[in-house]
């Protein structure tokens, strides 16, 4: 018996064509899951959907804004009509907003309240709403795996990213709350966990970590000096644990939030 087998499972990935979500979507399709990519832009999702199909695997796109409950309900109806069920939900939609990020010498009072609201809405509500809408369908079947994307910034205080960190901390707490609620009300086959990625270079943080000439910024050096593995992560290094949580191999695992950070959070610097 292969505990890691997810062949034929229906896996929803919000933000499934972004850097992180796209890596997960492609990987899960290669493991035999039917991947449903949820996002706002069919045009942006098309190259990934085409690649999935070219490799002989299954995947399709459903348009929805994760911050719009009615959008998500319509998406749920489309998915249940086409795929009949939801086995896996991965909430990969999220990101930072510049106005909710501070310079090292900038007081918090300069933060733009409207951008604080945006980053909280995108990350926190953009995770909670899909859990409620798609989770209802999973609860009806009393089985499935929900995987949220928190952040190492939720577990350790970082300078500058106050809005993003606060939103991800909310996701961490909500993940644990929902896991307890689901297990007690719907049984032990419906699980909720989260991953907390450390530092992975992507489009959103590239300018903060990499200088125009390709050298590392001062912030990057601070990060790497406090990362025992001494390097940034590669997005593909998230896929193994996502696979584990999505499969029956993690059947007794719920309410966990795992840092995937090269040891950053465990290092005191001494």
Which stretches of residues belong to each language-model region?
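Active-site helix of classical SDR
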Residues: 131, 167-170, 175
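Conserved glycine-rich Rossmann-like NAD(P)H-binding loop of the short-chain dehydrogenase/reductase
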Residues: 33-47
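Short C-terminal tail/terminal secondary-structure segment
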Residues: 2, 156, 242-243, 254-270
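Conserved glycine-rich cofactor-binding loop
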Residues: 17-18, 41
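Short, small/polar-rich loop/turn modules that mediate ligand/substrate recognition or access, typified
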Residues: 186, 191, 253-255
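Residue(s) in the substrate-gating loop at a strand-loop-helix junction
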Residues: 151
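Substrate-binding pocket helix/loop in short-chain dehydrogenase/reductase
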Residues: 100-117, 223
């Amino acid at each position: 018996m292969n505990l890691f087998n997810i062949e034929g499972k229906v896996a929803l990935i919000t933000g499934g064509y972004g850097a992180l979500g796209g890596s997960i979507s492609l990987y899960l399709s290669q493991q035999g899951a039917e991947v449903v990519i949820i996002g706002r832009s069919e045009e942006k999702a098309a190259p990934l959907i085409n690649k999935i199909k070219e490799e002989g695997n299954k995947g399709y796109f459903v348009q929805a804004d994760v911050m719009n409950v009615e959008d998500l309900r319509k998406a749920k109806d489309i998915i249940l009509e086409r795929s009949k069920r939801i086995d896996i939900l991965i909430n990969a939609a999220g990101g930072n907003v510049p106005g909710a990020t501070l310079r090292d010498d900038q007081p918090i009072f300069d933060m733009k309240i409207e951008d604080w609201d945006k980053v909280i809405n995108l990350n926190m509500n953009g995770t909670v709403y899909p859990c409620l809408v798609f989770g209802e369908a999973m609860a009806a079947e009393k089985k499935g795996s929900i995987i949220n994307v928190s952040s190492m910034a939720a577990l350790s205080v970082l300078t500058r990213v106050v809005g993003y960190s606060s939103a991800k901390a909310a996701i961490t707490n909500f993940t644990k709350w929902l896991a307890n609620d689901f297990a007690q009300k719907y049984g032990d086959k419906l699980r909720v966990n989260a991953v907390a990625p450390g530092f992975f270079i992507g489009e959103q943080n590239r300018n903060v970590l990499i200088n125009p000439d390709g050298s590392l910024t001062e912030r990057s050096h601070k990060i790497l000096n406090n990362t025992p593995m001494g390097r940034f992560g590669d997005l593909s290094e998230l896929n193994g644990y996502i696979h584990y949580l999505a499969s029956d191999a993690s059947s007794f695992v719920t309410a966990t939030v795992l840092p995937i950070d090269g040891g950053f959070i465990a290092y005191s610097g001494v």
